[in-house]
Amino acid sequence: MDKTVSQRLGQGTLHQKLKRIMEKSTILSNWTKESEEKMKFDFSCELYRMSTYSAFPRGVPVSERSLARAGFYYTGVNDKVKCFCCGLMLDNWKQGDSPVEKHRQFYPSCSFVQTLLSASLQSPSKNMSPVKSRFAHSSPLERGGIHSNLCSSPLNSRAVEDFSSRMDPCSYAMSTEEARFLTYSMWPLSFLSPAELARAGFYYIGPGDRVACFACGGKLSNWEPKDDAMSEHRRHFPHCPFLENTSETQRFSISNLSMQTHSARLRTFLYWPPSVPVQPEQLASAGFYYVDRNDDVKCFCCDGGLRCWEPGDDPWIEHAKWFPRCEFLIRMKGQEFVDEIQARYPHLLEQLLSTSDTPGEENADPTETVVHFGPGESSEDVVMMSTPVVKAALEMGFSRSLVRQTVQRQILATGENYRTVNDIVSVLLNAEDERREEEKERQTEEMASGDLSLIRKNRMALFQQLTHVLPILDNLLEASVITKQEHDIIRQKTQIPLQARELIDTVLVKGNAAANIFKNSLKEIDSTLYENLFVEKNMKYIPTEDVSGLSLEEQLRRLQEERTCKVCMDREVSIVFIPCGHLVVCQECAPSLRKCPICRGTIKGTVRTFLS
């Protein structure tokens, strides 16, 4: 039975007690001698997970033992724990919480928690000790040999070994694609790339062409030409948790399909300048290929370009530093790595994107939005737009705002302006193509929902003129378009203009259904405003009041009430979208968005802000 909170092991004695348990047990002692190094880093071992709780806060009303048994190890941050198998992180534990139940609730497809629940249903005793539970499952070899079978398909004599129900469901060390890719140094086949196998969840174990899945433990060998690693994985192990998670996410988009393999990227470095202090192998592994110009490279996935390499530069770090949304980067290194690098450079692009609440900007094309620099830097705009290369681009007829935006991005990314007319023209042509595609998408959306488009275009005017907020809010709740929590958050705002701002932005985020209810409600409760917005389409915006005369306390209170994420309606906003400049969502909600929920402009980058 679990110890209560008051019986928690002290920080200084936890490791000693675990050590004494291991020494007294002959089975455990022999096991640790044989696999001491594995246990040192193996989070799939419950004893090792237990040992991570030496610094766990004492006031948490959930025992370390129950957390470790549920698959969690301590991250070292407050009371946050992480599952060694599915990566789920939980914190803010409350009295009465069941770690296993919360694990099942938030990540039901986790193979470890499924195995745990299945075992608890089948076992007559629910209080098996964690040590006995861990070592009651001997290795497949100890139980009478490997369970294997040959596929019955006449087209494939693949050897299949299914350990999914007999072994630890995850290999922590192989949970990242990069770690799996590095195991293929002795891979014997040329027709099936290690990158494809690693992407499909397999790491190399040998002998021959034998590979294993890090999640379900399934093993495959006897690969043949034209085999697809992901398809074979799904065919032989359809219930693998890795495949279930993969099927729920979209396959990431690739900017340059011809450069998606490591070998293809490496071949581009044939004429790489020998004086550059970064090696082609490093760059190719990080997703970059050479563009045959100076030391310029591009990512095959996100199309991000880097140059001016210096001694000590790490391509992976630079990739995460400048292009944190790259899907190849996230898949290979993991979101934690990207977050860590971003945390090292919190003010890297802080001068970007100061958006203004003016009606002109609200109705402007998001792609035409100019990146604004801070006060006193306007002279730099003049300088960067006066080079012969930039002037030549302007003389060709490109939009001045588009050229200015393109040049600013180039300087922020590389530290220098464009060197040749060919370089800038190539980028401008691509930007114009993107703008045309986005315009088509916007027109399609506007045709599908003219009401939503009108609300979006008149957002600032509605902030000022909408006074009957609560009846509309109640109608949205009654129609289940918003939740009770979202309803209460807006209702609790201290002033009507703040309620109106939150309501309008929530309608824009929720989409057509919310816009329709907003329109019908407005027609009933404020016919004048309804006529101006939806019939005459003639909303007037009046410049906002100057709050500088208010007390600092009042200014702070107003700002605090405007800083709620418009998606989750819970956390504080912290992400600025590029290029539109809207600051409306938190760090947790931003990755799931492809378009800004306010202006519907395509999100081409993000900048994290730190509001004080």
From Swiss-Prot:
The modification Omega-N-methylarginine is found at R143. CDD domains: BIR, CARD_BIRC2_BIRC3, RING-HC_BIRC2_3_7, UBA_BIRC2_3. BIR repeats lie at residues 46-113, 177-243, 262-329. Keywords: Activator, Apoptosis, Cytoplasm, Metal-binding, Methylation, Nucleus, Phosphoprotein, Repeat, Transcription, Transcription regulation, Transferase, Ubl conjugation, Ubl conjugation pathway, Zinc, Zinc-finger. Zn(2+) binds at C299, C302, H319, C326. It catalyses: S-ubiquitinyl-[E2 ubiquitin-conjugating enzyme]-L-cysteine + [acceptor protein]-L-lysine = [E2 ubiquitin-conjugating enzyme]-L-cysteine + N(6)-ubiquitinyl-[acceptor protein]-L-lysine. It is an enzyme of class 2 (transferase). One of its GO terms (cellular component) is cytoplasm. Auto-ubiquitinated and degraded by the proteasome in apoptotic cells. Upon stimulation of death receptors, including TNFRSF10B, recruited to receptors and cleaved by caspases. Proteolytic fragments remain associated with the receptors. This cleavage presumably inactivates the protein. GO terms for biological process: apoptotic process; cellular response to tumor necrosis factor; necroptotic process; negative regulation of apoptotic process; negative regulation of necroptotic process; negative regulation of ripoptosome assembly involved in necroptotic process; placenta development; positive regulation of canonical NF-kappaB signal transduction. It holds the Pfam family zf-C3HC4_3. A zinc finger (RING-type) spans 565-600. Its EC number is 2.3.2.27. Expressed in heart, brain, spleen, lung, liver, skeletal muscle, kidney and testis. Residues 447-537 form the CARD domain. The modification Phosphoserine is found at S153. InterPro entries: BIR_rpt, BIRC2-3-like_UBA, BIRC2/BIRC3_UBA, CARD, DEATH-like_dom_sf, IAP, Znf_RING. The CARD domain inhibits the activation of E3 ubiquitin ligase activity by preventing RING domain dimerization and E2 ubiquitin donor binding and activation. The CARD domain-mediated autoinhibition of the E3 ubiquitin-protein ligase activity suppresses cell proliferation and migration. USP19 regulates the stability of BIRC2/c-IAP1 by preventing its ubiquitination. Coiled coil: none annotated. It is found in: Cytoplasm; Nucleus. One of its GO terms (molecular function) is identical protein binding. Interacts with DIABLO/SMAC and with PRSS25; these interactions inhibit apoptotic suppressor activity. Interacts with CASP9. Interacts (via BIR domains) with TRAF2; the interaction is required for IKBKE ubiquitination. Interacts with E2F1, RIPK1, RIPK2, RIPK3, RIPK4, BIRC5/survivin and USP19. Interacts with HSP90AB1. Interacts with several death receptors, inclusing FAS, TNFRSF10A and TNFRSF10B. Recruited to TNFRSF10B in the absence of receptor stimulation. When TNFRSF10B is stimulated, further recruited to the receptor and cleaved by caspases. Belongs to the IAP family. The BIR domains mediate nuclear localization. The CARD domain is necessary to stabilize the protein and inhibit the activation of E3 ubiquitin-protein ligase activity of BIRC2/c-IAP1 by preventing RING domain dimerization and E2 ubiquitin donor binding and activation. Multi-functional protein which regulates not only caspases and apoptosis, but also modulates inflammatory signaling and immunity, mitogenic kinase signaling, and cell proliferation, as well as cell invasion and metastasis. Acts as an E3 ubiquitin-protein ligase regulating NF-kappa-B signaling and regulates both canonical and non-canonical NF-kappa-B signaling by acting in opposite directions: acts as a positive regulator of the canonical pathway and suppresses constitutive activation of non-canonical NF-kappa-B signaling. This is Baculoviral IAP repeat-containing protein 2. It comes from Mus musculus (Mouse). The gene is Birc2.
